[in-house]
Curated annotation (Swiss-Prot):
Protein's name in the database: 1H-3-hydroxy-4-oxoquinoline 2,4-dioxygenase
Keywords: Dioxygenase, Oxidoreductase
Effect of residue 244 to A: Abolishes enzyme activity
Cofactor annotation remark: None. Contrary to most other dioxygenases, this enzyme does not require a cofactor for catalysis.
Class of this enzyme: oxidoreductase
Record InterPro entries: AB_hydrolase_1 (IPR000073), AB_hydrolase_fold (IPR029058), AB_hydrolase_sf (IPR050266)
Molecular function per GO: 3-hydroxy-4-oxoquinoline 2,4-dioxygenase activity
Length: 264
């Protein structure tokens, strides 16, 4: 792992592929890190210069830089990009890291970021989601709230990489980070209503591809198809899978979808 000090914090990152190839940032969600992309990054590194940054406080030492919000993560990423001297790049984000992706798209504009990719972003929160987030913010009950997410995500799979991510990698993060994550995730949904509303609010809209596997319901697929019919910049792409983690479960299909969208 390499590291940079930017915006008053330490950011660690992995880097692979030809540095002269198009640069692609892989952005995880809260309480995740570069390990989320252990299956996907090598596939994409055949065609891209792949960088997987870890958010502040998500490095191997969980360096404490005080409290922060999701807007801080966007500023950190912009500072990281400047420090690396990267002008042209694309982003692929997962889960609630997608809020950061769209914040950066808004700040840089569609001329610089004509396309972006979001993976398995919860577009339509279910009623139990709010209770999970509330429990996840509680100083003593956060473990139960966190486990509720894990149980939901593990219910439909025996995929070893996904289960390892849920049992070892995500629980590794301290309780303070989980509480912060749930607070910020809830704040974004309360502010914007849904990710579709957030994307629609962009004054300059890039082409946005949503790669997803879950939920399996036809209604969820139809929601996206209906939205795409009225918004030509939105491109839903369903791939086979039974989990919230397609980059771990089905990396070949995810890599193919990314290539086809970015290279079109």
């Amino acid at each position: 792992m390499q590291s940079l000090n930017v915006n008053g914090t330490l950011m660690t990152y992995s880097e692979s592929g030809d540095p002269h190839a198009p640069t692609l940032f892989l952005l995880s969600g809260w309480c995740q890190d570069h390990r989320l992309f252990k299956n996907l990054a090598p596939l994409l590194a055949r065609d891209f210069h792949v960088i997987c940054p870890d958010w502040r406080g998500h490095d191997a030492k969980q360096t404490d830089s005080g409290d922060f919000d999701s807007q801080t993560l966007a500023q950190d990423l912009l500072a990281f990009i400047d420090a690396k001297g990267i002008r042209d790049f694309q982003m692929v984000s997962t889960s609630h890291g997608c809020w950061v992706n769209i914040d950066v798209c808004e700040q840089l504009g569609a001329a610089r970021l004509p396309k972006t990719i979001v993976i398995d972003w919860l577009l339509q929160p279910h009623p139990g989601f709010w209770q999970q987030l509330a429990e996840g913010q509680h100083p003593t009950e956060y473990v139960a709230g966190r486990q509720s997410f894990f149980d939901e995500w593990a219910e439909t799979t025996d995929n070893a990489d996904v289960l390892n991510h849920l049992r070892n990698e995500m629980p590794w993060f301290h309780g303070e980070m989980w509480q912060r994550a749930c607070r910020e995730i809830e704040a974004n949904y309360r502010t914007w209503g849904s990710p579709l509303d957030r994307m629609e609010s962009l004054p300059q809209k890039p082409e946005i591809c949503h790669i997803y596997s879950q939920p399996l319901s036809q209604d969820y697929r139809q929601l996206q198809l209906d939205f795409a019919a009225g918004h030509s910049w939105f491109h839903p792409r369903h791939i086979p899978g039974r989990t919230h983690f397609p980059s771990l479960e089905n990396p070949v299909a995810v890599a193919q979808a990314i290539r086809e969208f970015l290279q079109a």
